[in-house]
Amino acid sequence: MKLTAGILGSLAGAAAVMAAVMYKTANGSHLKTHTFTLDKMKGMKPLTIFFISDVHRRLIDEKLLREAAVYKPDAVLLGGDLAEGGVPYARIEENIKRLTALAPVIYVWGNNDYEVSQQKLLSLLRAYKVIPLRNESVQFAYKGENVTICGVDDIRMMMDDYEAAIRYTDADKVNLLLCHNPDIHEQMRESDGIDAVFSGHTHGGQIRFGRFGPYELGGTGTVKKAHYLISNGYGTTKVPLRLGAKPETHMITLCGPDEPFS
């Protein structure tokens, strides 16, 4: 009996330690850097983007944002799940405030964003001059240059309309695509002229055991001739724990092949 109690106590202790490690991991802040070389940007000034998705219940770390500010980003792309049900609106507002202090913010909805009052969420976005994209595009100006940024609404909520989002793009010019769910890759065509696509949603599986998890780890690659980035995201869902899939944000430099650092 004493032996059984000892084993159970050891297991409980190990579980508590593991939970503490997973909680600490989930609350970390990591900034990853990437360079995407685009042929269409030959002769254009580089575009620097801070990308963050899946904030959920977290308050974005000010130290992380100070680190990001060193890169002087031209834009912030906010890839959905800024909020979820039960998150205080004051915290959502503070996150928006912190991001807009870094650079102009362009936002698309994620599935969890539909768990909060849309009227209140839109009011906060407008108050801080965030550009929300719902199956539409915007001409984004920076350093005397222009690119088109397309935003697709959430796929899981069946709010997406990819064709509407890319309706006014010119395949010969620089086109960026923002969509919370990476399943958007399936709707893309090479002829659409998308140069880079940014998504989150999967959390990199959030809790992984080696190679095994509910989703693949986030990463970069190419799809339909476009660069893609799928982020592990910044926050968590269901439980505030992570294992094998660190939270992450991203600083991406888009540049032409003529740039010396590309």
Predicted regions and their residues:
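Short, conserved loop/helix-junction motifs that constitute active-site signature segments
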Residues: 70-71, 97-102, 167-171, 189-192, ...
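Short, charged, surface-exposed secondary-structure boundary motifs
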Residues: 84-86, 142-144, 160-161, 206-212, ...
